[in-house]
């Protein structure tokens, strides 16, 4: 009898915990939906400053300084979630192949590689594999997810880093195109971004 009472109490407590968890999940919008609201077309992009490790610009790169010279494309990669991301490599390769088309439109492309501070430089070097990025591309590091968190793009799940994202900013820093991928795929192609310019 005592075992039956304990089992009933356990079942009731489990149901209560499950109900609370389900109601909290129902009330909390998905992180991607939050990011889509914060990064909606017409919004002004938050300024940031990140270290360049390759490409046209060097040193600390500040978005507002780059944006003062024209339109900017911001591409957020996944970084190193335990291995180098083949979809990120393909996307960067696509932008490299189309670099002259972005230059012809007086548009800078900032590729952001997020990750924990430890080993981020090493992982970025592995990702680039000695590739020299042509102008107008610049490869930036986001140590400790400072940028990623500020933009609401942190993919906080095991072996994940950031939601792959592409933003196109006009000369005033307003978002005129945004694509946030909820999976590893569904990235913006260079052609899609060039069309948005």
Regions flagged by a language model, labelled:
Residues 1-11:
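Bacterial N-terminal signal peptides that target proteins for export
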Residues 9-21:
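Bacterial N-terminal signal peptides
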Residues 22-26:
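Boundary at the C-terminal end of the N-terminal hydrophobic targeting segment
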Residues 27-65, 90, 94:
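N-terminal "domain-start" segment that seeds a small globular fold
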Residues 63-95:
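Short active-site neighborhood of thiol/selenol oxidoreductases, capturing the structured segment around
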Residues 84-135, 146-148:
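Structural microenvironment flanking redox-active thiols in thiol-disulfide oxidoreductases
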Residues 134-137, 154-167:
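Structural micro-motif
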Residues 161-197:
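Thiol-/selenol-based redox modules, centered on thioredoxin-like
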């Amino acid at each position: 009898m005592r075992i039956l009472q304990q089992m009933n109490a356990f079942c009731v407590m489990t149901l209560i915990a499950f109900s609370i968890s389900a109601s909290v999940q129902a009330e909390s919008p998905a992180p991607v939906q939050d990011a889509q609201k914060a990064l909606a077309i017409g919004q002004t992009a938050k300024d940031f400053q990140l270290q360049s490790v390759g490409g046209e610009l060097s040193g600390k790169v500040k978005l507002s300084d780059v944006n003062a010279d024209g339109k900017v494309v911001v591409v957020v990669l996944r970084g190193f979630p335990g291995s180098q991301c083949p979809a990120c490599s393909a996307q960067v390769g696509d932008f490299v192949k189309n670099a002259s088309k972005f230059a012809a439109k007086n548009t800078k492309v900032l590729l952001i590689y997020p990750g924990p501070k430890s080993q981020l430089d090493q992982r970025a070097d592995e990702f680039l594999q000695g590739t020299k990025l042509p102008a107008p591309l610049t490869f930036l590091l986001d140590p400790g997810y400072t940028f990623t968190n500020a933009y609401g793009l942190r993919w906080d799940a095991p072996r994940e880093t950031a939601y792959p994202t592409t933003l196109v900013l006009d000369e005033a820093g307003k978002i005129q195109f945004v694509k946030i991928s909820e999976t590893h795929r569904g990235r913006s192609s260079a052609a899609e971004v060039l069309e948005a310019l």
